[in-house]
Amino acid sequence: MIEHRPPAWAACLLLLAACGQSESPAKNSVTVKLPPAGVPVAPESSYSSIDPASCKVVGDSIRRCEGAAGYALEMDGEVAIVAPDGRRSILDLSKLGTKGAPKLGAKAEWRGPAPGHPHVLIVRVGSDLAIARLEYPACIVAVVAQQSHQNEKAREIADGKLPACLSR
């Protein structure tokens, strides 16, 4: 019996023919479309409720509100950001003139290059907007007093180079 084998160059042709073909992604993979290099990515916001009715009570008195991308806010007289890995950072709201438990708005805005990748939290405290960086240890980096275009001003700060923490 004579064995017929294709020439070695045939394998090269098959490889070249496959070039330019797209592979189908694995079933458990995530495909992210990125803009071309050098094109800036517009920041995006996602929102979560911090209304007491939508949060759960953990322990004796801590109210835990789920946020974006695995983050959470915990409140019991103070406000803490809980990172996806479980690390807690207590936000110092004393610079906002709050006495006792701070009066928070009904929602938190999580801002970053994509909804699933926030790097900043914007939350209403009284009539002010507090901007907190999420990088551990999280901290408040700016406060925007009540004014016209307050939300836009807070987003402008959040989308730029973040200032240093206001206090530790």
Region roles according to the model:
Residues 80-125:
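Mature extracytoplasmic domains of secretory-pathway proteins
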Residues 47, 55, 73, 108-110, ...:
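Generic structural hydrophobic/aromatic packing signal, biased to beta-strands
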Residues 1-17:
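Sec-dependent bacterial lipoprotein signal peptides
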